[in-house]
């Protein structure tokens, strides 16, 4: 693996959330037909359905603030697991919502794509 998995995770995370927060319709190139998204209780497969779900989310403005980022190699083939926690500011809400997200990144040529993506809001008990 040419890139350190921690550096890859950091670079991916910055790119993903910057793109999500500015124009989430452009995230499709990060997914493939076999990619899967679990968003709360919805499960979607394939780049087209995943992007349709992300675009359909009921907010105009969003800002992710990352609190923690953890990464591990996921296989001898160069896969990387990335777990993120943070705050989500939606539209003009003052109170942020906590979230967790896990990505399973798969190598493809000289880059990576999202094989699995699990997103969950974390509500207070």
UniProtKB/Swiss-Prot annotation:
Coiled coil: none annotated. PROSITE patterns: NTF2_DOMAIN (PS50177). GO terms for biological process: protein import into nucleus. GO terms for cellular component: cytoplasm; nuclear pore central transport channel. InterPro entries: NTF2, NTF2-like_dom_sf, NTF2_dom, Nuclear_transport_factor_2_euk. Residues 8-121 form the NTF2 domain. GO terms for molecular function: nuclear import signal receptor activity; small GTPase binding. Its main location: cytoplasm. Keywords: Cytoplasm, Protein transport, Transport. It is found in: Cytoplasm. Facilitates protein transport into the nucleus. Could be part of a multicomponent system of cytosolic factors that assemble at the pore complex during nuclear import. This is Nuclear transport factor 2. It comes from Eremothecium gossypii (strain ATCC 10895 / CBS 109.51 / FGSC 9923 / NRRL Y-1056) (Yeast).
């Amino acid at each position: 693996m040419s890139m350190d998995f921690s550096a890859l995770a950091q670079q991916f995370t910055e790119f993903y959330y910057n793109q999500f927060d500015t124009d989430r319709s452009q995230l499709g190139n990060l997914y493939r037909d076999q990619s899967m998204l679990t968003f709360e209780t919805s499960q979607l497969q394939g780049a087209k359905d995943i992007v349709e779900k992300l675009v359909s989310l009921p907010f105009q403005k969003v800002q992710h603030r990352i609190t923690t980022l953890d990464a591990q190699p996921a296989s001898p083939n160069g896969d990387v697991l990335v777990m993120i926690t943070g705050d989500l500011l939606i539209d003009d809400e003052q109170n942020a919502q906590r979230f967790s997200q896990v990505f399973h990144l798969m190598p493809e040529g000289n880059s990576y794509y999202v094989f699995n993506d699990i997103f969950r809001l974390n509500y207070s008990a």
